[in-house]
Curated annotation (Swiss-Prot):
SUPFAM superfamilies, alphabetized: Kazal-type serine protease inhibitors
Record-linked PROSITE patterns: KAZAL_2 (PS51465)
Listed name of the protein: Extracellular protease inhibitor 10
Keyword Secreted: yes
Kazal-like domain boundaries: 23-72, 90-127, 156-210
Low complexity biased stretches: 71-92, 211-224
Gene3D superfamilies reported in the protein's UniProt record: 3.30.60.30
Amino acid sequence: MKSAFTLSLALVAVTATISAAADDNCSFGCLDVYKPVCGSNGETYSNSCYLRLASCKSNNGITEAGDGECASTPASSATPSPVTSSTGSTSGTVGCPDMCLDVYDPVSDENGKEYSNQCYMEMAKCKGTGYDDNKRSGNPGISTLDAERKLAFAPGYQGPPCGDMLCPDNYAPVCGSDGETYPNECDLGITSCNHPEQNITMVGEGPCPSQEQQQQQQQQQQKL
């Protein structure tokens, strides 16, 4: 009887250790981009990154069953839909996106109503409203919000979170510490994400100076 009790304690300790390790390795973040995928557990996830996050926390027990929302959510599930934001907030309507990227790429539904992009149209249909917080008239603009998004990566995580980052198609050049000019800060962030060993950071707004310009700047500094 004593041996059985000791064995039970050992199993509990091993389980707790595995759980703690999983939590440590599953601390990466995901972008709030609504590109739903269906998990093998019948749950809909905002995007493939959120599915990988849930799978990581369940010891890789969830796989991607297909693109788009699941046909139905299991009635026995007592937990809310895992369609959440990176801050942990959950959508008020199961399976509906909480937010969309502030990118102007207008689309119209079957009734001719125009939305700023596909995500806002899907949000309105899902919630049964005409909601389109990003609706614009006149000259379209692009928020810098998505350019400022960052992902936290867990040590040893083997997934490709950099591939889930999306950038606006706007030209707001910045100069990187590697001497390269990037279309915008978000594009620089993706390159930095894909090449962490280079530790690329933004050194200034606008294109990087050419070699000739650098030489002229050095000459002017020497004269001073």
